[in-house]
């Protein structure tokens, strides 16, 4: 799975939190403290689209963008990728389970049946 750079993550956080699609100009306004050019945001959005993180709506002008998957789906994919890359999956799972709270452990038990 492709990783996110710092600006990519900032844009994705906005898209994940937004109930509606966003244009590059919307994102520029929401990230005004960074003083980014619209072209910079468009470049980042293009990269995110190429990586499969965003979907561009071509029927509106300016184009509007939405997250291709929820934040939770993205995080689950990352967890699965990490586990898949382990040479000793059991050791990784043991370490993970050893670090979860009692409430999270109960949730895991419930989900596993």
Label for each model-derived stretch:
Residues 9-14, 26:
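Pre-recognition alpha-helix immediately N-terminal to the DNA-recognition helix
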Residues 4-7, 59-78:
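Short, cationic-aromatic polyanion-contact patches
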Residues 49-59:
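A short, conserved structural fragment
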Residues 21-30:
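Short acidic, hydrophobic short linear motifs in intrinsically disordered regions
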Residues 42-46:
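Short, hydrophobic-biased segments on the C-terminal half of alpha helices
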Residues 15-21, 69:
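Short helix-capping/hinge SLiMs at alpha-helix to coil transitions
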Residues 77-113:
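Amphipathic alpha-helical dimerization/coiled-coil segments
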């Amino acid at each position: 799975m492709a990783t996110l750079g710092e600006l990519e993550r900032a844009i994705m956080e906005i898209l994940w939190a937004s109930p509606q699609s966003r244009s590059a100009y919307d994102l520029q306004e929401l990230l005004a403290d960074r003083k980014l050019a619209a072209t910079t945001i468009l470049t980042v959005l293009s990269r995110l689209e190429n990586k499969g993180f965003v979907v561009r709506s071509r029927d509106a002008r300016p184009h509007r963008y939405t997250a291709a998957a929820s934040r939770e789906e993205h995080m689950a994919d990352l967890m699965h990728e990490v586990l898949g890359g382990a040479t000793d999956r059991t050791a990784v799972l043991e370490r993970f389970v050893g670090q979860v709270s009692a409430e999270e452990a109960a949730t895991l038990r419930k989900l596993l049946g």
